[in-house]
């Protein structure tokens, strides 16, 4: 009887290990977004396709940079707004407006060719963000069932966003993007804004997105949709309610392996066998280095890693002949 492990003890141990891994990764995760780089480097590449757009390595990199800029704390003071504005102007974008209500933050920007709506992701020290993430009750809509936390969070800024789009972007193509919680908000935004702006939504790019709704909801999203996943990114596996929540969009998988040219491999679709092997390899590597086995699963969610990998791929594939 001494060898029998109670289910409660297993859950308690798993929670303890997760908390330890989370604490180890938290500092890196939070500080990753403080090193905001200007966007001038993006001008070295040709302009990607804009209307009802197919997947583009260039646009994926642009959107990844836009998502990283969403982590500027522009809601805190004017200095941070100026910081965001400077970074955008360095890449020939103009800041139209920032949005902040409760736990939801986003900004709208545009250049001469297209507009971008970028949502901020989960901040580990913000209770509103955490509460949104864990509120996995599904709300029934005419288009299926959607995570009520994500839907409510988008509704907090929906009217303001629609107003700004009507006034400021005209008939411009609109790209929508986000990371983590922001990816979920971008998903909901894409579906909600299709009612009025369906002819203008060029594409939605998400990074490290959780599951957002059921299969009916997924099918209701008509805009081009690209879901980018980095190796063991743990957030892409939640909510852990398989069969009820599903992912939206055409997946692109960023591998831990590199090609001969030194760039990371990117797969179209989700190569489940390869991902399983890489997850095992990452976990074993952490154990061999005496780290918490969950650390690589959390570290892989860093937006900085997404930007680094996508930058290399975009530059390599768009080299002049």
What label would you give each PLM region?
Residues 1-177, 181-321:
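Non-catalytic, mobile gating and regulatory segments of ester bond hydrolases
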